[in-house]
């Protein structure tokens, strides 16, 4: 066991994490040069294209060190994005060490810091690495100062390398072996294995990626998952050297996979403990929690006959993404669709993009909403994730909305504009620190404000230099109201929005004005109203199209003209009673685009 090293790589987007992983795999001969491709561990096209890692992957490598010993290195590739922070914490708890990769030309960024703190809390040894030192803009001294300043770990002897050219990659592995402790654990103790990730394979069912903490696991043994108490027979165990390779057994300290014919991904929860069914471990490994969706949105097929196809697509996606939740929902305006829950905004974008790409769906998405805690007047508390399900104002005692703590990092030139943005979004400043040229701002902001367009606005006010990460803090009582949109007196459920009272007038007026531009003129007058409960706060009219019925009366008597106009009026009135206004799909997207000016 002294020759095993389990490590992962922490880095901000585009700091070269996947490239470094590629080089390490190549150096250790995990794949022949023919099979080598860039970003080996990012298996989804979407991961490659966006340059992000979504699912955790592993590679078991053998490396002959300079001291002549052969070491087994287990590389656990972690997602770097804040939406997947729970997965990151599971991946990190399976490791003893982490390479902190920092781009020498850019310095420290928000997500690096967030994941690095997670690593330090879990007691993982962090080894700093400066990447991209072949760039003319590289400034290693500055980057080292930032690592020491912002994260507070000693970085004087940080390894300098360039993953692109392969320069210094061996030094990275050497310092990894020197600094990271070997895994602790007893191969003879009762089995305890941590599920780092799981995914669905069409041939063998669910594949679980595990780190064996104690004990030994062999094929044909019966295992039990401690969170659900379900039992299965193990069919295969093995490791990935990115390609899968079956082994006789997996023992303490190793990272590998278990295949045991599980059909449902929801059975193999990330962070759960696997143990023997016959002599189970006395207690599960700490840190397991159920992942709860934070952001909800409605997904509807553009064509009504695509509903079944959408359901199948969601089921298939759910096989590989246990944190996605969905339930059927009917909207008067959009027909049949699903209400889906996501971990965060990036997760939502990815799910939408995969549905459109891999399953050729055409989708309409409603405005993303967050979950509100509503205390009703009879004292019961309900969770409302859909504005249409919000009770009547008279039955509500108080509404609590989710508050998140946001950490923002930016160069000091942009502090003013970022603070202005946070104030607009009802944020309260908690902290502000200067680290050299970088500034760290900490804010508490209602999640609903972040969901809409905070990230895009942040990037635009800081010219792309600011980075952020957020985590849920608590539910807090707030004065939020539900604004309904009425068209000719009928509520349109899909257009309801929940906003803070201070912004309700403005948002109501904006949406109404936007709808007026979008809805085509009808043969009769259309009234668009925004209402809070029974109180109308905004109104726009769309004038009717009318034929000039007086065209054929030259001169003539006024009573004749009056008669014709009255007759036209009667007709319009009748039309209005039976006519229904078609709402074009752009109207639903318009709500999303009502920015806070």
Swiss-Prot record:
Which Enzyme Commission number(s) are on file for it?
3.6.5.n1
What reaction gets catalysed by this protein?
A: GTP + H2O = GDP + phosphate + H(+)
Instruction: Tell me the Gene Ontology biological-process terms attached to this UniProt entry.
Output: positive regulation of translation
Q: Which InterPro entries match?
A: EF-4 (IPR006297), EFG_III/V (IPR035647), EFG_V-like (IPR000640), EFTu-like_2 (IPR004161), G_TR_CS (IPR031157), LepA_C_sf (IPR038363), LepA_CTD (IPR013842), LepA_IV (IPR035654)
- Gene Ontology MF: a single term: guanosine tetraphosphate binding
Give the principal location in a single coarse category: membrane
Q: Which CDD domains match?
A: EF4_II, EF4_III, LepA, lepA_C
Broad class of enzyme this protein falls into: hydrolase
Assigned keywords, A-Z = Cell inner membrane, Cell membrane, GTP-binding, Hydrolase, Membrane, Nucleotide-binding, Protein biosynthesis
Residue ranges annotated for the tr-type G domain, each copy included: 2-184
**Keyword Cell inner membrane assigned:** yes
GO CC terms of this entry = plasma membrane
Q: Which domain of life is it from?
A: Bacteria
Annotated membrane topology is: Peripheral membrane protein
Q: Its family?
A: Belongs to the TRAFAC class translation factor GTPase superfamily. Classic translation factor GTPase family. LepA subfamily.
Q: Spell out the protein name for this chain.
A: Elongation factor 4
Species annotation: Burkholderia mallei (strain ATCC 23344)
């Amino acid at each position: 066991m002294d020759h095993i090293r389990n490590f992962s790589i922490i880095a901000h987007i585009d700091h070269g994490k996947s490239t470094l992983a590629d080089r390490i795999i190549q150096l250790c001969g995990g794949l022949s040069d023919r099979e080598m491709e860039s970003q080996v561990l990012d298996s989804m096209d979407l991961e490659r294209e966006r340059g992000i890692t979504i699912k955790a992957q592993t590679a078991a490598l053998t490396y002959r060190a300079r001291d002549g010993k052969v070491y087994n290195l287990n590389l656990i590739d972690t997602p770097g994005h804040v939406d997947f922070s729970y997965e990151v914490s599971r991946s990190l708890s399976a490791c003893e060490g982490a390479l902190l990769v920092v781009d020498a030309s850019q310095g420290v960024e928000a997500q690096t810091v967030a994941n690095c703190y997670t690593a330090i809390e879990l007691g993982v040894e962090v080894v700093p690495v400066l990447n991209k030192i072949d760039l003319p803009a590289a400034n290693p001294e500055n980057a080292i100062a930032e690592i020491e300043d912002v994260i507070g770990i000693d970085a004087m002897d940080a390894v300098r390398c360039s993953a692109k050219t392969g320069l210094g990659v061996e030094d990275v592995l050497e310092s990894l072996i020197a600094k990271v402790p070997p895994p602790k654990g007893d191969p003879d103790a009762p089995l305890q294995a941590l599920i780092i990730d799981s995914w669905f394979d069409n041939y063998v069912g669910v594949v679980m990626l595990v780190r064996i903490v104690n004990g030994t696991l062999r094929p044909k043994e019966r295992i039990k998952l401690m969170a659900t108490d379900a039992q299965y027979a193990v069919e295969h165990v093995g490791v990935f050297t990115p390609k899968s390779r079956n082994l006789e057994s997996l023992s303490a300290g190793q990272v590998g996979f278990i295949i045991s014919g599980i059909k449902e991904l929801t059975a193999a929860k990330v962070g759960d403990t696997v143990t023997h069914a016959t002599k189970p471990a006395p207690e599960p490994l700490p840190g397991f929690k159920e992942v709860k969706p934070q952001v909800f949105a409605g997904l509807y097929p553009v064509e009504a006959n695509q509903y079944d196809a959408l359901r199948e697509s969601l089921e298939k996606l759910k096989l590989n993404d246990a944190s996605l939740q969905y339930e059927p929902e009917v909207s008067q305006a959009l027909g049949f669709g699903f209400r889906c829950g996501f971990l965060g905004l990036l997760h939502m974008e990815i799910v939408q993009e995969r549905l459109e790409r891999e399953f050729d769906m055409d989708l309409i998405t409603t405005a993303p909403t967050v979950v509100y805690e509503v205390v009703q007047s009879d004292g019961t508390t309900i969770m409302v994730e859909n504005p249409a399900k919000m009770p009547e104002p008279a039955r509500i005692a108080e509404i609590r909305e989710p508050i998140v703590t946001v950490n923002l990092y930016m160069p000091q030139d942009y502090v003013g504009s970022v603070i202005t943005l946070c104030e607009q979004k009802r944020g309260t400043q908690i902290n502000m620190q200067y680290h050299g040229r970088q500034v760290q701002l900490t804010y508490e902001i209602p999640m609903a404000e972040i969901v809409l367009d905070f990230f895009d606005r942040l990037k635009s006010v800081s010219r792309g230099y600011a980075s952020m990460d957020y985590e849920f803090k608590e539910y807090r009582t707030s004065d939020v109201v539900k604004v309904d949109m009425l068209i000719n007196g009928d509520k349109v459920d899909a257009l309801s929005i929940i906003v803070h009272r201070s912004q309700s007038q403005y948002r109501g007026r904006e949406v109404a004005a936007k709808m007026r531009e979008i809805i085509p003129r009808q043969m009769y007058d259309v009234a668009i109203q925004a209402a809070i409960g029974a109180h109308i706060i905004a109104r726009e009219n769309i004038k009717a199209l009318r034929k000039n019925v007086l065209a054929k009366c030259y001169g003539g008597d006024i009573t004749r003209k009056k008669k014709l106009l009255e007759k036209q009026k009667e007709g319009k009135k009748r039309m209005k009673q039976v006519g229904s206004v078609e709402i074009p799909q752009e109207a639903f997207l318009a709500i999303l685009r009502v920015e806070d000016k």
